[in-house]
Amino acid sequence: MSCKAFQGQTLREHIEAMLAAWEIVKNKYIPSIIRVMKTVGVKFTEEDADKFMKTLIILHDVGKCSEVYQKHLSNNEPLRGFRHELVSAYYAYNILKDMFKDETIAFIGALVVMMHHEPILMGQIRSLDKEELTPEVVLDKLRTFNGVMEGTESFIKSMIKEKLGVIPKVPSPTQEDVLREVIRLSVLARHRPDSGKLRMVVGALLIPLVLCDYKGAKEREGESPKFAEVLRVEMMK
């Protein structure tokens, strides 16, 4: 399978570039990941934090393996509002739960993946607030989703085995599965008694993921002027 992340860059190439970026900055971010996860009762070792972030990197864009997204990249067919992050979050929740055997880790990881393009959604899904992520909104963002490309499951398994040495259970998402899971996660996020703390944790985890995502995209299209200085500073050893 050759799933594209962008025009001119396969998903594997994008993941590889992000993982390379993570290796450069991880010593800066692993301590903060351990600290923020501790606030929600998760005791990460350095190895756990590294494994968690690498899993997020591998899974954050797997929703782009959706048939609708690949047709958009290959044939310029319209996405009609489709958001790949929602499918990616479904994968992240199920795979993280299988790998870590912990509901909180899976829950938080899925939210991070769901929101990793939050700053650029421009009025589509800007937050986890009720008015932003209603069932109607989620359904609208998934109405053109009709499954993923053949080979997606084996791609995910091979990437995680190659990078982390484990073979996870990988679900086969239907539109109904993704819709139900995303709505459930968003409801839980809004109504937990520690929702304020949860926002802080998700925000802290988004920083290294988004940084590596920009770095991975830079390998394809070059630095954007506004982000170039941030990249130069953060990627310094």
From Swiss-Prot:
One of its GO terms (biological process) is defense response to virus. Keywords: Antiviral defense, Endonuclease, Exonuclease, Hydrolase, Magnesium, Metal-binding, Nuclease. Optimum pH is 7-8. ssDNase activity requires Mg(2+), ssRNase activity does not require cations. Both ssDNase and ssRNase are inhibited by EDTA. Its cofactor is Mg(2+). Monomer. This is CRISPR-associated endonuclease Cas3-HD. It comes from Pyrococcus furiosus (strain ATCC 43587 / DSM 3638 / JCM 8422 / Vc1).
